Amino acid sequence: MHLLLFQLLVLLPLGKTTRHQDGRQNQSSLSPVLLPRNQRELPTGNHEEAEEKPDLFVAVPHLVATSPAGEGQRQREKMLSRFGRFWKKPEREMHPSRDSDSEPFPPGTQSLIQPIDGMKMEKSPLREEAKKFWHHFMFRKTPASQGVILPIKSHEVHWETCRTVPFSQTITHEGCEKVVVQNNLCFGKCGSVHFPGAAQHSHTSCSHCLPAKFTTMHLPLNCTELSSVIKVVMLVEECQCKVKTEHEDGHILHAGSQDSFIPGVSA
C-alpha cells in the first residue's frame, strides 16, 4: 500500500511535465500556421491605411515569412514612415478647396502659359510689319499709287491673271475741293509672244493687263476761282491681257513681271 502511494506521487509530476511539453510543441507547430493568417488579415483589418499607404512588403514576402510578428510589424512601420511621404496624397489634392474650382489653371501651369502668350504677342506685330512692307514694296513704288492698299493676294503674283481691282480714286486740282470716285484698276500677269523667223523679220510682242471695257465721266469740281474745272475720268469695268497702244489713257506700273494699269484723269 505504501509502495503504491509512493509510485503515484512520483508519476503525477512526470505526467504534468510531459503534458506541458506537448502543449508547447503544439503551440509552436500552430504558430507558423496562424502567423501567415494573421498577416493576411492585417490589410483587411486596417483598410483605410492600406488605401493611403501601399504595402511595401508585397514585393518581398520572404521578409515576412522569416521574421517574427513583432519584428515584422516594427520593420513595416519603419519602412512606411520612411517612404510614406512619396505615396500619401496631400490633403489639398484629396480635398480640393472651392477656390480651386474657380481657377482655370493651377499656379504652376500659369507660369508656363504666360511666356507662350508673350511670344504670341511679340510675333503678331512682326507679321503686321511684314504685310505692310509687302504692300509698300508691290503697290507703293510710284507717287501715283501712294496711299492705295489693294485687295490682292500674295499668291496671285505667280499666276497669269488679269482682273479688275476696286479702289477709291481721289480727284484733285489746285484751288478746288477733292472728290473721291469709286473706280477699278487692272491688275494681273500677262505673257509675251515671240514669232521666230529671220533676224530682220522676227517679232516679239508683250501683252499687258489693260481695260477691255470702260466709260468716261466728266466730273465738275467745286473751285474757288471763277472759271470752272471739269475733270474727265475713265471708269474701268473689265480688264484683259492685250498689247498696249499709244492712244490709251492711263499709265502702267511695272513691278517685276507684274503689271498694273491705273486709269488716268485729264482736265
Swiss-Prot record:
Which compartment or compartments is the protein found in? Secreted
Q: Which residue numbers delimit the CTCK domain?
A: 162-246
Tell me the PROSITE patterns matching this sequence: CTCK_2 (PS01225)
Q: How is it modified after translation?
A: N-glycosylated.
Q: What is this protein called?
A: Cerberus
* Protein family according to the UniProt entry: Belongs to the DAN family.
Task: Fetch the Pfam families from UniProt.
Answer: DAN
GO molecular function annotations of the record = BMP binding; cytokine activity; morphogen activity; protein homodimerization activity
Q: Which residues cross the membrane?
A: none
Q: Which residue ranges are recorded for the region named Disordered? A: 19-52, 87-113
Write out the entry's keywords from A to Z.
Cytokine, Disulfide bond, Glycoprotein, Secreted, Signal
Q: What does this protein do?
A: Cytokine that may play a role in anterior neural induction and somite formation during embryogenesis in part through a BMP-inhibitory mechanism. Can regulate Nodal signaling during gastrulation as well as the formation and patterning of the primitive streak.
Q: Which organism is it from?
A: Homo sapiens (Human)
The residues that carry sugar chains are 26, 222
